[in-house]
């Protein structure tokens, strides 16, 4: 893990490694140099000596109103890295490297204006992906949020910043999320029950509880109480990039859920309880594998889900449709929204209503008929 402020890491062999930009390719890609020392302070001193020779000393910020965006973006990320979950750190680093750096890398902090940022947002909104297609408004909003954080950090270092940038907001237009119809859900349920194995039981569990795919993969049998008929969600699994910037390697990360409200206990219905109790597993280790040494990661579950949809003759959808479907069925069954919000692990009822609840046309028609009956003249 790096110490605050500089790109200095402690290696597994006990040495400290300092990284700096030595030069750049013709395309502007940075080429890094590395320094090694037996202590953090020695590595820091050697790194600062090299940077001073490059005319880019980080301890001269008070004299350097023209400090470039790249410097502050790297320093902000390193300074606050210990405050972020590992997955959050990797997410921020990716947004900086893939979107902010190509546009603002050599720009002077004080020269970045509201107009520049608006032009940047418009550009990535229309063709920000690698294939030249548009980014989602959610991703653009996330990128803008990181940019604001970096500029706030620069402002705290007495660098002039256009305050109008902080007022920019991206209007998000959420798309209707796909939900399985009742007939599609019954078709899927019939297949899962008729082909019992660990993965199919896991998919059925998501359909009946609304847990996320990462939460399913990290679920262990000791978090399921068949006697009390509930399951405890307290961790999630995902595959993320390593912290080494130049590496393309990834690793599995099992960590706490995305928020404190996502730590929750979910009651198990009598129908799901019967399936869990009948399944011939040793009921130890990970729920999906029955082993503490072998795990099944989200992309494997996603692939299985796609194959099942194909076998059922259903339209191909993302695994998250199970969560949306669960929430929608709960609303149709008139389950209390506050209760549903806690089962889903949301921090507020508003999130549940706006993001995951999609009343069907049939429910809307029934509501209108109820209104007509109420106001009709007898």
Annotate each language-model stretch with its function.
Residues 77-159, 174, 294-300, 315-318:
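N-terminal core-binding DNA-recognition domain of tyrosine site-specific recombinases/integrases
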Residues 156, 204, 208-215, 307, ...:
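C-terminal catalytic core of tyrosine-transesterase DNA break-rejoin enzymes
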Residues 228, 239-263, 270-272, 292, ...:
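C-terminal secondary-structure termini that scaffold catalytic or DNA-interacting sites
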Residues 172, 179, 237-239, 273, ...:
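Catalytic-site neighborhood detector that most strongly recognizes the C-terminal catalytic loop/helix
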Residues 11-17, 22-118, 281:
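N-terminal DNA-binding module of tyrosine recombinases/phage integrases
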Residues 187-191, 243-247, 333, 354, ...:
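DNA/chromatin major-groove-contacting recognition/catalytic segments
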Residues 134-137, 141-143, 156, 160-162, ...:
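Basic, Lys/Arg- and aromatic-enriched nucleic-acid-binding interface segment
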Residues 183, 246, 267-315:
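Active-site/catalytic core of tyrosine-dependent DNA strand-transfer enzymes
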